[in-house]
Amino acid sequence: MARFELQKLYIDGGYVDASNPETFDAINPANGEVLAQIQRAGKDDVERAVVAAEKGQKIWAAMTAVERSRILRRAVDILRERNDELAALETLDTGKAISETRYVDIVTGADVLEYYAGLVPAIEGEQIPLRDSSFVYTRREPLGVVAGIGAWNYPIQIALWKSAPALAAGNAMIFKPSEVTSLTTLKLAEIYTEAGVPNGVFNVLTGSGREVGTWITEHPRIEKVSFTGGTDTGKKVMASASSSSLKEVTMELGGKSPLIVFDDADLDRAADIAMMANFYSSGQVCTNGTRVFVPNALKAEFEAKILERVKRIRAGNPEDENINFGPLVSFEHMESVLGYIAKGKEQGARLLCGGDRLTGGVFDKGAFVAPTVFTDCTDEMTIVREEIFGPVMSILGYDTEDEVVRRANDTDFGLAAGIVTRDLNRAHRVIHLLEAGICWINAWGESAAQMPVGGYKQSGVGRENGISSLAQYTRIKSVQIELGDYASVF
């Protein structure tokens, strides 16, 4: 029997039954428990959500900027009041350690909403003089109804990253969470309504990407799709969005990011950064620095420092505050990660630690994979080329700066990159050469609300967060005013 009641769709300010009779299960990956049955939206539900969003968006956009800002700030306050409750639910649904969800996921999501709530009154047009008798003014108008499609690794945070700028700009949003982790997004919808966001301005449709995601992407009256997920799926979403009605898109996709340790680096700091870049959130972070480049002369010393730190990982029940490493998000994903680990062994990478499923005690019922470190890796190996999205670090040796920059850029992805060095000149020189949209020097992973994030190459299109993302949820209308005579050639 499920722990929670049947989860319905959230449309037009409240829960409604789906037109589709099918449901799917939300599973706790720490122990296999069925948390809830969730209704699967039908195609008619997508249309119902669009109609509600169109109605609500007109009301929302007609409010003054200050009114919209106040309502969004109320939502921030409610999020913070319910931080622990939301974090507990997120941990059950994702398997993420409560130490992450309680102190990072909800907190940083609320920070992003607060950031955009403060920017609402700053959405302004321009006045452009042409001549004494004429000028142009511009208006930044909302797009209308937009859609967000989320990934399973940061459910409520991603929903906030997408909805905050969209709502701040006066749009309505239809959001489809990942089928794997849907629960907290439904709670976010409740919070928006409680804060005073008009009915229909934030709707949640649950179900598969293959069906519900496709119907959303193809709907002709949705003006934009913001998608977070894998590159292959992102390409399909982008193609569908374009072919259906030339929708605008934001794509935050996969990565295989390089972390370069230089020969002057503080190796203890470098090892700490590498651990965070590979094992935080059990390795399920799109920006992870999974290709760790280390000078050959320092590789053995660096490996020893990594092994020393792996021993400090506290794996176990993610509801335990002392744990910092939980299960993977699902048993299906666990099998995928184990398959990559097997390929690493087959292709000749040297296994330093891990390499298998964690077993015994609490681990037997959950989707736990041991923190895994491979070394003596080569650029052609599958574990070095493809995104694994799990706790698997690959260490690669190198000799020269030119070599490591070339190899770091030898990937179809370009989401993130980082370097560790004491040489500030080298730091800036190398960062400017790396083909990645998010870069860190002597750090890894922080993505503040003010910081635009997004990828180069096949890691994405557009940006999330920062002022520029707010503009991506508006369109510019140009208006010319003529005060003088008008001359016709006819």
From Swiss-Prot:
Claim: NAD is one of the keywords in the record: yes
Binding site for K(+) 2: L246, K457, G460
Oxidoreductase as UniProt keyword: yes
Cofactors that this protein relies on: K(+)
Site (Seems to be a necessary countercharge to the potassium cations): E248
Entry keyword set: Metal-binding, NAD, NADP, Oxidation, Oxidoreductase, Potassium
Cofactor binding description: Binds 2 potassium ions per subunit.
Protein name: Betaine aldehyde dehydrogenase
Gene that this sequence comes from: betB
